[in-house]
Each structure stands twice: as C-alpha cells, then as structure tokens.
Amino acid sequence: MNKVKSISLMFPLYKDRSTVKLMSKKSVKVLKKLKKKYEIIIVDDGCPQNSGKLAKEISKKYSNVKVFFHKKNLGYGAALKTGFKKFKNDWIFMIDGDNEYDVNDLFRLVKASENYDLVITYRYKKKYTTSRILISWIYNAILRLIFNLKFRDISTGSRFVSRKLVKRIKLRSNSPFVGAELAIKAELAGYKVSEIGIHTYPRTFGTGSSVSFKNILLTLKDMFLLFSRI
C-alpha cells in the first residue's frame, strides 16, 4: 500500500504570465489543506513574457515555492525533466501552468494512488475547439494502436507519479510527448498505472502552444523514436 507522505507540485511556464500568480495561490491553498509536507516547483521554459521573474517574486512570498529557469525555450518535456531532477518529495503532481486543469483534483489523485505508482487522467468533456479535439482524438488513437494502450486519454497535462518511478525511468522526450512516454515506459517496466476522470476548463488567458505545428511535429518525432526503441 502506498502512503503519500510528501508532495511536490510542478508546473512549467511558457507564455503563462497571466496565470502564474493564480496557479501558485491555488496550489498553496490545496497543498496546505492536504496537511502533508510539500513544495511547489515552477520551471520557466525560456518564457518571453518574464513569467519566471513574476514566479521568483512569488517564491519570496511563499517559502515552499522554488523556481528554475531555462535560458531559452527547450520544450514542454524538457521543462518537466528539469522539475524531475529538482523535486525532493515522495510524489510529484504534474499540472500545466495555464489554469485549464483544477489543482483540487490532487485530492482525488492522492486517494487514487493507493497501490499504484502512476495515476494519469482523462477528460470527461473537452471544452476545446473542434480542431484541438480532433488532434487529441487522432493522437490518442495512434498511441493506442502502436503501443497497444488501453488508456482513454494519454495526452492530458495532469498526472501523479511516485518518486520511485520517476527516478528509475529515463525520459528522452523534450516535446509534449513526454507524458505519454512516462506512462508507456511505466507499463513496460511493470509499474501499476491507474487513471481517473477530470474536468478541464477553457483557457482564459493567452493561447496554448502544445498543438502548434512545430510541437505536433516534435511530438510525432519523439513518438516514433520511442516506438523504434521498444
């Protein structure tokens, strides 16, 4: 039985200046309610909006907030891998910094982690544009086909993973494929993976970059590189 004693909450920043303060405040509130040892890790992935500078100011207000910087934009996967190198606690909650996901889902993720090493999420209803829903559907269909997966949705930005798993699996992807890579390698290595349903919310500030043409190409590249290695 897994007992969650301490949690590291991590989110990357890229063009998320408008939400970093809100995400930090929500995260602190939820983690305090859980009454467990915690830290918040923010990784500025070369953000052009000085989001990291704002995050640094937030870290002065909250001692449990730690901020790390990339000098240039290295990619979503690279930002998460930096967080994986820096976190200190037993479990890590990965969530995007754009406020599309609800930090309160952490309560359910902690509960769902009993007897599992990784808990991924699927979206009950995707409140996105038709094109983004179509891209997500095609992406998940390809993943299920070539990797023989049974997960409903492997492309969400909300996951809860044990330190044991993170430290034993080497992740290579710098693209948004990193989340799928984590789940695929966890299954192949014999770790127990569960999934729960969550609600997502429309982005209220800025525009996301995960479904940009560049990121789609990089994701496909990382996907087929992994497929060629297994």
Q: Residue ranges of each PLM-predicted region?
A:
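Acceptor/aglycone-binding surface of glycosyltransferases and processive sugar-polymer synthases
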Residues: 68-86, 91, 103-176, 201-221, ...
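A short, conserved alpha-helix in the catalytic core of glycosyltransferases
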Residues: 165-169, 175-192
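Short, well-formed alpha-helical segments that are part of the catalytic scaffolds
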Residues: 16-31
